[in-house]
């Protein structure tokens, strides 16, 4: 299903999330199962299915990484059963540095300072990756979409790193 069509958006990475929320509320009102309480079982089931589609579509378009994956899938690049690895050696080296920094936090006398530095580093890198991703997805050609898929892979890795850092910080607070 094309969630951009469902929410009446032109397929694009950069969308107005305020307008998305507004259209979500409108669609929820239109398809809410309570509106079909006196209808046939088939109509009730359809209302439940439509509500699920609206919810899934909203959460997909609301989150930039999921939105990018959806846009790529519409363009023929499916990342749902991803097995491709990142081949960017500069990024892989940076990844190793970040992993070492995460490990160093556990043995640090000033862990919060290192945590803050890593959050800043992750945030800056994610911002750059999202900017590049947005540019690539505007091009809408096969080569750009394959490069965009690499950006999505990197951003997924960054999300995992962010989660690991959050877990380390939470463990230090316990």
UniProtKB/Swiss-Prot annotation:
Protein name in the entry: Co-chaperone protein HscB homolog
PANTHER family per UniProt: IRON-SULFUR CLUSTER CO-CHAPERONE PROTEIN HSCB
Residue intervals of the J domain: 2-74
Keywords: Chaperone
A GO molecular-function descriptor: ATPase activator activity
Signal peptide annotation: none
Keyword Chaperone listed: yes
Entries under PROSITE patterns matching the protein: DNAJ_2 (PS50076)
Pfam families according to UniProt: HSCB_C
Record flagged with keyword Chaperone: yes
Function: Co-chaperone involved in the maturation of iron-sulfur cluster-containing proteins. Seems to help targeting proteins to be folded toward HscA.
SUPFAM superfamilies: Chaperone J-domain (SSF46565), HSC20 (HSCB), C-terminal oligomerisation domain (SSF47144)
An example Gene Ontology biological process: protein folding
One cellular component (GO) term of this entry: iron-sulfur cluster transfer complex
Family to which this protein belongs: Belongs to the HscB family.
UniProt-listed SMART domains: DnaJ (SM00271)
Highest taxon in the source lineage: Bacteria
Assembly and oligomerization: Interacts with HscA and stimulates its ATPase activity.
Species classification: Bacteria, Pseudomonadati, Pseudomonadota, Gammaproteobacteria, Alteromonadales
Organism, scientific name: Shewanella denitrificans (strain OS217 / ATCC BAA-1090 / DSM 15013)
């Amino acid at each position: 299903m094309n969630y951009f069509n469902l929410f009446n958006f032109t397929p694009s990475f950069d969308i107005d999330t305020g307008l998305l929320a507004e259209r979500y509320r409108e669609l929820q009102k239109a398809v809410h199962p309570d509106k079909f309480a006196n209808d046939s079982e088939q109509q009730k089931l359809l209302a439940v299915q439509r509500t699920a589609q609206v919810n899934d579509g909203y959460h997909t378009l609301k989150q930039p990484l999921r939105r990018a994956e959806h846009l790529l899938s519409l363009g023929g690049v499916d990342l749902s059963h991803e097995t491709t690895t990142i081949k960017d050696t500069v990024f892989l080296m940076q990844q190793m540095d970040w992993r070492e920094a995460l490990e160093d936090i556990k043995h640090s006398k000033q862990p919060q300072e290192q945590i803050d530095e890593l959050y800043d580093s992750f945030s800056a890198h994610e911002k750059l990756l999202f900017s590049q991703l947005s540019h690539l997805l505007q091009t809408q050609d096969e080569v750009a979409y394959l490069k965009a898929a690499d950006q999505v892979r990197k951003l997924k890795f960054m999300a995992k790193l962010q989660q690991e850092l959050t877990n380390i910080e939470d463990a230090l607070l316990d």
